[in-house]
Design a protein with these regions (language model features):
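PLP-dependent aminotransferase-like
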Residues: 1-14
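A broad detector of the eukaryotic-type serine/threonine protein kinase catalytic domain
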Residues: 8-11, 22-23, 58
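Short hydrophobic/charged patches on amphipathic alpha-helices used for structural packing
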Residues: 14-18, 71
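ALDH superfamily catalytic-core signature
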Residues: 25, 31-166
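Short, surface-exposed connector motifs at secondary-structure boundaries
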Residues: 1, 18-25
Length: 166
């Protein structure tokens, strides 16, 4: 068999693949809304489909975990590819006995992250587009309006180019 990964926007690459008669199986990871569209299109030709929908990718940390080992994994799981992967750790579920220690240490690690151009030796690069940046800023604004307490915030390096999606 052959596995082809075709990057591109859904309206272009995705639509073309969904309607192509040579595609005999679809696998989609993403939003429920788009997953339903993929499933409906696949059903028209009775093409098998595998869907992983919804996201949130929680990371689970139990009280017997080695926090020193868990911490770098949790940070990387959240910021890999600037958090723009379907498996980005958007939630961390922590067992009560270690909650205080882990959240304090995680907040300290996150606060030390620096964001900027991908060519510099930084922990986190820019978001893919202004649309995505605006979307993320909208999530943060709604969280603040809902009274969510932020435990940490990273920083943008001072010499980051203007117009970057940081």
């Amino acid at each position: 068999g052959v596995l082809n990964i075709v990057p591109g926007l859904g309206e272009e690459a995705g639509e073309a693949l969904l309607k192509h008669p040579g595609v005999s199986h679809y696998s989609f990871t993403g939003s429920t809304e788009i997953g339903v569209k993929v499933q409906q299109e696949a059903a028209k030709r009775a093409v098998p489909v595998t869907l992983e929908l919804g996201g949130k990718s929680p990371q689970l940390v139990f009280s017997d975990a080695d926090i020193d080992k868990a911490l770098p994994f949790l940070v990387n799981a959240a910021i890999q590819n600037a958090g723009q992967t379907c498996s980005a750790a958007t939630r961390v579920l922590i067992e009560k006995p270690i909650f205080q220690e882990l959240t304090e240490r995680l907040a300290k690690e996150i606060s030390s992250l620096r964001t900027g151009p991908a060519l510099q030796d930084l922990e986190c690069g820019p978001l893919i587009s202004k649309v995505q940046k605006d979307r993320v800023e909208g999530f943060l604004l709604r969280a603040k309006q809902d009274g969510v307490e932020f435990l940490a915030e990273g920083s943008i390096v001072e010499d980051a180019p203007q117009g970057g999606n940081y």
